[in-house]
Amino acid sequence: MKTYLIDLDGTMYSGNTNIDGAREFIAYLQEKGLLYIFLTNNATRTKTQAKEHMLNLGFKNIKEDDFFTSAIATAKYIAKNYSERKCFMIGESGLEEALKEENFIFVEDKADFVVVGLDRKANYTKYSEALHHILAGAKFIATNSDRLLANNGLFDLGNGATVNMLEYASGVEAIKVGKPYQTILNILLEDKNLKKEDIILLGDNLETDIKLGYEGNIETIMVCSGVHDENDIERLKVYPTKVVKNLRELIKD
């Protein structure tokens, strides 16, 4: 039995708006006893907040253990590969919780790492402080590099815009953990005791969700409900295994 790795923003919902067919698809997986994990690049929410958000949107039987975020993967990646624990963070509660769970401490001076996730309240001063740490030698690590974030039918700036700004200013390329980089997948597979042949990646974004699977030789399903549609496939040269307009197409009697 394969495990679905399911994207959230643009696949399950757009901000506070349900994606048509998403609740029905999750209910179908639950009814059939099919396995799934919500694999999201959105590092802003804790697992508890992510669960509550979906329950508020009308999804049923959602558990905290259903979620694996780029924040969790980033914290695990740094903890596994480095012994230092002092970090300067740009991010929200999801990234803060993930770093604390791996025993990182937050500092304003002499940071070992600058960890950058989406922060919708960050300002020029915060970005400049991050730049100072990077120029002083702190390792620059990004949860994800999404250009856009689906939000109630519109698109907001994604974390990739902030990461690119800091890369340009510092001349230092960030270590990127989230989709489409294999790092997040390798950490998840180890954490969940899965293999590549055990999974199906499902998402709306060719540059992240589908690219991760395409480059990793993993089965993918693209749903045309968010950032991209089938007209973008040839332009981006990223080819999903299957394309659907609506997740209801995946529901089988």
Regions found by a protein language model. Give the residues of each.
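Asp-based, Mg2+/Mn2+-dependent phosphohydrolase catalytic module
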Residues: 2-6, 14-20, 24, 28-31, ...
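Conserved phosphate/oxyanion-binding catalytic-loop motifs
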Residues: 42
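Short amphipathic alpha-helical/adjacent loop interface patches that line ligand
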Residues: 71
